[in-house]
Amino acid sequence: MSLIRGLISTIYYLPKIYKWFYRPYYFLSLLMTLAFVIVRCCPGLCEHLPSQREDGDSCAFDWREVEIFMFLGAIVMMKNRRAVTVEQHIGNIFLFSKVANVVLFFRVDLRFGLLYLTLCVVFLITCKPPAYMGPENIKYFRDSTIDEELQRDSRVTWIVEFYANWSPECQSFAPIFADLSLKYTCLGLKFGKVDIGHYGAVAERYKVNPSPLCKQLPSLLMLQAGRELMRRPLVDKKGRAVSWNFTEDNIIRDFNLNEIFQKYKKFSKGEKPEEPQPVLEEESESPLEEEEEDSESKKDK
């Protein structure tokens, strides 16, 4: 099922994926992924490679190499079951294909393995995935502005993402969060981001651990008047994040975005905001108090 879903998703986003390979990162990643296949099947190169096939054909895959490719496919399918975006699907394919290429090149020749491993290290250091540059309606906070901005208006609900640029999960989640900000931003609901890789003090104040071992990045916090109402993912007693998929549907459901948006939607049309909810609750309780006073007065009589 996961293989079929991934295949359908790839076909659906094929025009978008096609444009990615104009970018150096994705183009070079594709070459690194197909490196062993190119070397093994390219005339003029494959004739000089050793082979363990019975017929001695060095331009064809032996059975052990086929097994490694099959194992690679199984690992990619397992990892892509939790992938949310197309970027995550493609990233998993690139990552585990490079690992498989390292094993395959070392089987052929130690020198080829060391050369490919060196290329992978250089690529990892010099090439970074392109950051999301699409439309969004997000306010970026700094250490000195986040507390003041969150407490400025107690009627505004903030959905704040705590992220780090080095985190692949945060990079994959960026287009999802941007799309949500475009759909749900209104006068009473706003979206913000803070880079805890640069502002570690903010992470400490809001109890978000940036360590990769804790897997708390990205973290989404719902805040109102500077007070935390909800967060995802949740954190257990050991400080590790409880598994939670950062899909658009999960965020809309768990944070009640539809209800909050409908509540504040009329504010964006220029209507005067209503009184805060606590005042309305007090007004709704006042008739009950009057009834109790009337009953007590009747008893006294």
Swiss-Prot record:
Residues 20-111 are extracellular. Residues 133-301 are cytoplasmic. SUPFAM superfamilies: Thioredoxin-like. Pfam families: Thioredoxin (PF00085). The chain crosses the membrane at residues 112-132. Residues 280-295 have a biased composition (Acidic residues). It is found in: Endoplasmic reticulum membrane; Mitochondrion membrane. It is a single-pass type I membrane protein. Residues 122-269 form the Thioredoxin domain. GO terms for biological process: brain development. Keywords: Disulfide bond, Endoplasmic reticulum, Membrane, Mitochondrion, Signal, Transmembrane, Transmembrane helix. One of its GO terms (cellular component) is mitochondrion. A motif (Di-lysine motif) lies at residues 298-301. Residues 1-19 form the signal peptide. One of its GO terms (molecular function) is disulfide oxidoreductase activity. The keyword Amino-acid biosynthesis does not apply. Residues 268-301 are annotated as: Disordered. The thioredoxin domain lacks the 2 redox-active cysteines, suggesting that it lacks thioredoxin activity. Monomer. Homodimer; disulfide-linked. Occurs in both reduced and oxidized monomeric form. Oxidative conditions increase homodimerization. Endoplasmic reticulum and mitochondria-associated protein that probably functions as a regulator of cellular redox state and thereby regulates protein post-translational modification, protein folding and mitochondrial activity. This is Thioredoxin-related transmembrane protein 2-A. It comes from Danio rerio (Zebrafish). The lineage of its organism: Eukaryota, Metazoa, Chordata, Craniata, Vertebrata. The gene is tmx2a.
